[in-house]
């Protein structure tokens, strides 16, 4: 595939420079899969969008995003040493988290699955927020660890920018999904900066204690980011799997073993047992949070990918697991500084994967490596379809408000009830509503 220049719609011009902010700025922070990613060859200025894209998705993804974890640095790095992965910062960081595939086809068909923060950005602009003065975005390389310097220092820089551009006003962070975990890591690692720059933190659909069903299955079989007809054009489940096995961020969203779950998450496998070549039986085996590690190891022992004519082994990565365990320690210890208000929105009313089962009684698993080519059966709990409500509601921070909203994991970003809550907590309302209110008020006064 050729390397095609990727024009970015939106700029970082200073059209609002010099304006006096009339409100505290808002910084939108995306979650996993919620940022546009570009790649380019080193010593080249030409970039190609590799996430998200509908057309040629699999090819671009394999070429640029398949990676290997480097235990010496803590980063996951492209298989091709000549490739760099970048996050566009156009439109004050908003471009990368707005419409994740801003191609004409997506806009023409209005594929809402990739309209990420778009509706929320429009809502905030409609309430009087101005890009570059009181509204900013932070997209990042979501393959990386939530506590890695690249991400944490990037967030710090974006907070500093919002603080300065608004005339020294403290920032309201609105984070989605895994973005809430990164904010938690930042809060622990840079408490003074968090206190200096942040006034409020609104988090949406954050897997504070992990997302057991979805993450366990992602490690074993992958994930389908887009469902339905569009998935035919998109990154395949298995192509995605071969990336996620080497992503620290995925391991950091495994179920928290220190959390007191109502019921411990499990992985179940219907196993074929053979005492000799003739007698066989079928048993349902269960693996808890600790035992699942051995299951991951056995299931992924033969996992590999082909890249550039070479076979590359991709077993379960214990170096990433060790790194993720230290991240979990940070997440468990993080504390909200005095003077910062915390608000939590989490999804409810949707069947959400919790326990995962592979094989059936009539079609059992012989060798555990077969799991990776098996579609799972789930046991469901209440949640947003991705994160259990039990996890998303279990922030360890004292909340001004914690509200369950009926909606899907990504759908919450365009949910009217969520918008109402955000407007209430920010103390704003749409301009049209204000004008209507003022006109009514004048009529009353004139009487």
Curated annotation (Swiss-Prot):
Regions annotated as coiled coil: none
Domain of life: Eukaryota
First-tier enzyme category under EC: hydrolase
Residues at the active site: 177, 384, 409
Primary localisation category: membrane
Subcellular location: Microsome membrane
Effect ascribed to mutating residue 409 to L: Loss of activity
pH dependence: Optimum pH is 6.0-6.5.
Keywords: Endoplasmic reticulum, Hydrolase, Lipid degradation, Lipid metabolism, Membrane, Microsome
GO cellular component: endoplasmic reticulum; membrane
GO molecular function per UniProt: O-acyltransferase activity; phospholipase A1 activity
EC assignment: 3.1.1.32
Activity's thermal dependence: Optimum temperature is 60 to 65 degrees Celsius.
Similarity section: Belongs to the AB hydrolase superfamily. Lipase family.
Functional summary from the UniProt entry: Hydrolyzes the sn-1 acylester bond of phospholipids. Phosphatidylcholine, phosphatidylethanolamine and phosphatidic acid can be used as substrates. Weak activity with lysophosphatidylcholine and no activity with tripalmitoylglycerol and cholesteryl oleate. Seems to have a preference for unsaturated fatty acids at the sn-1 position.
Protein's UniProt name: Phospholipase A(1) LCAT3
């Amino acid at each position: 595939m050729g390397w095609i220049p990727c024009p970015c719609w939106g700029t970082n011009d200073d059209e609002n420079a010099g304006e006096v902010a009339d409100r505290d700025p808002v910084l939108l922070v995306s979650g996993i899969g919620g940022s546009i990613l570009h790649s380019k060859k080193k010593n080249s200025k030409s970039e190609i969008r590799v996430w998200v894209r509908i057309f040629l998705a699999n090819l671009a993804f394999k070429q640029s995003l398949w990676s290997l974890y480097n235990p010496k640095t803590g980063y996951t790095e492209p298989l091709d040493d000549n490739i760099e992965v970048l996050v566009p910062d156009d439109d004050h960081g908003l471009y990368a988290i707005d419409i994740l595939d801003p191609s004409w086809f997506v806009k023409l068909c209005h594929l809402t699955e990739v309209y990420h923060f778009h509706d929320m950005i429009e809502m905030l602009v409609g309430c009087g927020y101005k890009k570059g003065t009181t509204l900013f975005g932070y997209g990042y390389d979501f393959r990386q660890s939530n506590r890695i310097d690249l991400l944490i220092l990037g967030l710090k820089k974006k907070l500093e920018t919002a603080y300065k551009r608004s005339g020294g006003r403290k920032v309201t962070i609105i984070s989605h999904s895994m973005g809430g975990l990164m904010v938690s890591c930042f809060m622990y690692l840079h408490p003074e900066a968090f206190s200096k720059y942040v006034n409020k933190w609104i988090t949406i659909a954050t897997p504070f204690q992990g997302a057991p069903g979805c993450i366990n299955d992602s490690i074993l079989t992958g994930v389908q980011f887009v469902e339905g007809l569009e998935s035919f054009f998109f990154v395949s489940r298995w192509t995605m799997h071969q990336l996620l096995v080497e992503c620290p961020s995925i391991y950091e969203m495994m179920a928290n073993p220190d959390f007191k779950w109502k019921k411990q998450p499990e992985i179940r496998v219907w196993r074929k047992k053979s005492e000799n070549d003739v007698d066989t039986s079928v048993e349902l085996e269960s693996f808890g949070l600790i035992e699942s590690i051995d299951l991951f190891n056995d299931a992924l022992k033969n996992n590999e990918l082909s890249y550039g004519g070479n076979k590359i082994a991709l077993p379960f990565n214990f170096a990433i697991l060790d790194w993720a365990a230290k991240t979990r320690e940070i997440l468990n210890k993080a504390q909200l500084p005095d003077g910062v208000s915390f608000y939590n929105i989490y999804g409810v009313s949707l069947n959400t994967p919790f326990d995962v089962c592979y094989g059936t009684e009539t079609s059992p698993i012989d060798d555990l490596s077969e799991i990776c080519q098996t579609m799972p059966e789930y046991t469901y709990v209440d949640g947003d379809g991705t994160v259990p409500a039990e996890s998303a509601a279990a922030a360890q921070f004292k909340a001004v408000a914690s509200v369950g909203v009926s909606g899907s994991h990504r759908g919450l970003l365009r949910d009217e009830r969520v918008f109402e809550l955000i407007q209430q907590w920010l103390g704003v309302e749409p301009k049209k509503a204000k004008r209507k209110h003022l006109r009514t008020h004048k009529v009353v006064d004139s009487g």
